[in-house]
Amino acid sequence: MNAADYLKKLAVIPVYKDTGNLVKVLTKFRDKIVDEICIVVDCATKDDLYEMRKAAAKIGTPVHIISNRDRKGVGYAIREGIEYGLGKGHKVAVVMAGNNKDDPREIPRLLTPILNEGYDYVQGSRFLPGGKREKNPFLRGVFSRLFPFFWTLSTKVRCTDVTNGFRAYKLKIFSDKRINIWQSWLDSYQLEYYIHYKVFTLGFKMKEVPVSKIYPYRHKGGYSEISPLRDWWKIVGPLVYLKLGVRN
């Protein structure tokens, strides 16, 4: 076994109120895919937390639950997961949806380039050969296709999927003083695109790998309620701000 396989690996799953889909996600985790799972849930009831803990007790991977009484935002939730991972000595984090759009059985696709090939950041892409997408909402599908084109133009780094939240990275990137994820303007969807831009432009070794993105016909919770029409600036803003030097 490669020595890199012993790097502690954490799965971070941000969730908004949802329990039913999260339970489905947890059942797909296989032993030793990651060392620990950190669920960060906003606005969960006592019953929600009970169901999460009951589902967590049935799998072989340790699960830590962080519960926020108020809705903090997906960026805030991911940051809490990152902070937890850093505090527990994890070296790699996998971030994924808690609403059953991402398949934990595909986590090795994201981890292999980091563990065996020296990559710092691996982005899952539904558009690469071998990737899969089903039931994508029309507007979101169009936006997801077009947005990487503008990222490629702006960063000079070719990419095929930017809005897919299924990705993995070495936690050491956050020790770089040029990356400051602890800014309040990153509490919502902005954080993911902030990290993406920094990795693209600061010389970290990154690649894309094919993954699946399967949308349910109706989806609630799990921080999947993003709308390109309503939330477009939270998605586009980090690229504009950082490119123009307005934000750090």
Regions found by a protein language model. Give the residues of each.
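Short, high-confidence coil segments that cap the C-terminus of an alpha-helix
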Residues: 34, 90, 118-119, 204
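A short helix-to-beta-strand connector/capping loop
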Residues: 7, 59-63
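A conserved acidic beta->alpha catalytic loop
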Residues: 41-52
